[in-house]
Structures are given as C-alpha cells and as structure tokens.
Design a protein with these regions (language model features):
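Class I SAM-dependent methyltransferase SAM/SAH-binding core
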Residues: 69-72, 79-141
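A short His-aromatic
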Residues: 101, 158-159
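Hydrophobic beta-strand segment of the Class I
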Residues: 84, 151-152
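Conserved alpha-helix/loop element of class I SAM-dependent methyltransferases that forms part
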Residues: 38-83, 94-101
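Short, glycine-/aromatic-enriched active-site segment of Class I SAM-dependent methyltransferases
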Residues: 185-204
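N-terminal auxiliary segments of SAM/dcSAM-dependent transferases
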Residues: 2-48
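A short glycine-rich, Lys/Arg-flanked "PGG" loop and its adjoining helix->strand segment in the class I
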Residues: 164-179
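Short conserved loop adjoining the S-adenosyl-L-methionine
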Residues: 140-145, 161
C-alpha cells in the first residue's frame, strides 16, 4: 500500500507571518469596535449559529473580540468530564462555552499566540478552576501527549502554513479515539505558489 503524500508547506516566512497575525489580533483584542475586514463580536457568533444560552452567560470582553469563522460546536456538544484543547482560543469564547459543557470535573486548555487575547480570556474565566489559558502555537502545543478527548479550533488552521504539522500536533495531544471539531475557511480552487508567499493574503 502506498503511503499518502504529505503536502509541501508554502514557502512563507513563518516568523514574519506570525508577527503579522499577532498585530492584527492584538488590534481586535484592544480595539474590538474599530472595524475590520472580517466580522467580529456577538453578531458574528449569532450568524455562525451560537445559541443565545451559550452567549448570555459570557463576559462581554470575550464576546466583543470574537473573530471566528465557524462553530465547532455545530459538530456536536461536548460531554461532561471531557478534556478539551482549544487551539487559537483568542479572547476565550469557545473555551468558556466548552468549560460549561464539560463541567467542573472536565478541563479546558486554551492556547493562543496573542498576549492581549489571552489577557481577555483569563479575565473572562474569572475563578473557574477547570479552565487554563497558555501562550503557544498550534504547531507546538504546550500540552502532554494523549491528554485531550477533544481538540477544537475556530478560524485558526487556515493561518498555519504547514497544515500537516498542525494536524500532527492535534493527533499527538488526543487520546486514542479522540475527536477534532473545527470551524474554519477553505479555498475552492488552487492557489498559485507565488501567491502563497504573500503575507498580506494570509492575514487579509
């Protein structure tokens, strides 16, 4: 049986890309009402199918800086006592919803590379003891092997140039039989190689 071909990652400077993404989402965290080329906040969450009962109990600081592209919970609610990793947690809206679903006997780790987003997420968590927010990258998750029952992510995988590396990390932190629930965006046509190198297309 022939092994599957691993796609080649685009030739883009990862550090430059990360800096550009951080700059963009620092602005979303600090100035959520400024207006961006993408939708944000509660209106976006409602468009994406987030239930009012999930949103009503969340801090406004987490909701106002929400910038997801999908709804990972549309793939299924999480179970009590499950362990969850939220990759690219942003201001924490998905992590906090997950924390409510898994209950105090479960655990949620939210990971993001943007410090201002993490500050909002931590503030939003308040005294919840089963939610933790860590600085990190999706390709280098600060999570032990086989820790999670579920990995969730929302609008982040599209920003990672090496998708194979990203999904390999997800597989590493998942328990056997664990699951992935992702909301994201896809292109429906091939992207020329030279276009993949343009930082402004990744962040725009």
């Amino acid at each position: 049986m022939t092994a599957p071909t691993v796609p080649t990652a685009p030739n883009v400077d990862r550090e430059v890309l990360r800096e550009a993404i951080q700059e963009e989402y620092e602005a979303v965290a600090r100035e959520p009402d400024r207006g961006f080329h993408f939708h944000t906040g509660r209106p976006l969450a409602e468009i994406l199918g987030y239930q009012a009962e999930w949103l009503d109990g969340l801090p406004e600081g987490s909701i106002e800086s929400f910038a997801g592209t999908g709804n990972p919970f549309s793939l299924g609610v999480l179970g009590l006592e499950e362990r969850v990793v939220d990759i690219g947690c942003g201001a924490g809206i998905d992590s906090l919803i997950a924390a409510g679903m898994v209950g105090p006997e479960g655990a949620v780790i939210g990971i993001d590379m943007t410090p201002s987003m993490l500050e909002k997420a931590q503030a939003g968590a308040g005294n919840l003891e089963h939610v933790e927010f860590l600085l990190g990258f999706g390709e280098e998750l600060p999570v032990p092997d086989a820790w999670a029952d579920v990995v969730i992510s929302n609008g982040v995988v599209n920003l990672m140039p090496d998708k194979h590396e990203a999904f390999t990390e997800m597989a590493r932190v998942l328990k056997p039989g664990g699951r992935i629930q992702i909301g994201d965006i896809l292109v429906d046509r091939p992207v020329p190689e030279n276009e993949k190198e343009k930082i402004e297309l990744w962040t725009g």
